[in-house]
């Protein structure tokens, strides 16, 4: 698949049903997914005006944690996940976080490879983290 440039924007209330559907396609969505979408900082990747993925972030002391990062199956291998991750990194730096963290189950080899390939290292059981530069602002 070719690289597709996504427009990344903040979550809007009318995104909830579509993003819940995206989460359902990946690992099954539930009431926790709704809570994440309603309470956390969520950014949506749009391709040609339609949501192609999202990342949900929450503060964890001096770190920013990726709670969910999903890409629509029809947009896999187009760079959408990488763009969302880069956006999450930038947001975390702007919020003065020192680390970006994500919990990944040991059997999720694809996700482990994705994050490790972008510089994340082991920080605990199922926890990966990326040390961030200081914000210059």
Language model feature labels by segment:
Residues 2-67, 72-74, 85-87, 91, ...:
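Acetyl-CoA-dependent GNAT
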């Amino acid at each position: 698949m070719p690289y597709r440039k996504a427009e990344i924007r903040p979550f809007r209330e009318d995104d909830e049903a579509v993003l819940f559907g995206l989460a359902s396609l990946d690992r099954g969505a539930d009431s926790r997914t709704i809570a994440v979408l309603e309470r956390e900082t969520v950014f949506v990747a749009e391709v040609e005006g339609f949501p192609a993925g999202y990342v949900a972030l929450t503060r964890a002391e001096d770190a920013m944690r990726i709670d969910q990062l999903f890409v629509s199956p029809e947009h896999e291998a187009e760079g959408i996940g990488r763009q969302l991750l880069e956006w999450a990194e930038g947001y975390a730096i702007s919020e003065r976080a020192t680390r970006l963290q994500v919990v990944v189950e040991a059997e999720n080899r694809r996700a482990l490879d994705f994050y490790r390939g972008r510089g994340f290292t082991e920080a605990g059981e199922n926890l990966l983290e990326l040390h961030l530069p200081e914000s210059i602002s």
